[in-house]
Amino acid sequence: MVIKKLDVVTQVCPFPLIEAKAALAEMVSGDELVIEFDCTQATEAIPQWAAEEGHAITDYQQIGDAAWSITVQKA
């Protein structure tokens, strides 16, 4: 299993989701993508996209006043 970190802090929506989709597309099943972001819309958009695609959210936490980290495991 590979764990890749994607730092999209300061990027506005929808770019965190676009970059997450591109990064996960290059990964294999079971790999994890740790996405750090500060776009409030992505707090809903990324988990919704992951669920629709069948990927698992293995970790989701707030890191600071207005930033989050979410880990998506590729299906």
Swiss-Prot record:
> What sections of the sequence does the record tag as coiled-coil?
none
Query: If researchers knock out this gene, what phenotype do they report?
Result: The tsuB-cysA double deletion mutant cannot grow with thiosulfate as sole sulfur source.
Q: What induces it?
A: Member of the CysB regulon. mRNA levels are increased by disruption of the rppH gene, which encodes a RNA pyrophosphohydrolase.
Would you say which domain of life the source belongs to? Bacteria
Q: Quote any Pfam family the record assigns.
A: TusA
The entry's active site is C13 (cysteine persulfide intermediate)
Which InterPro entries does the UniProt entry name for this protein? TusA-like (IPR001455), TusA-like_sf (IPR036868)
- Membrane-spanning residues where? none
UniProt-listed PROSITE patterns:
UPF0033 (PS01148)
Q: Which family does it belong to?
A: Belongs to the sulfur carrier protein TusA family.
UniProt function note: Involved in thiosulfate metabolism.
Q: What is this protein called?
A: Putative sulfur carrier protein TsuB
Instruction: Give the source species.
Output: Escherichia coli (strain K12)
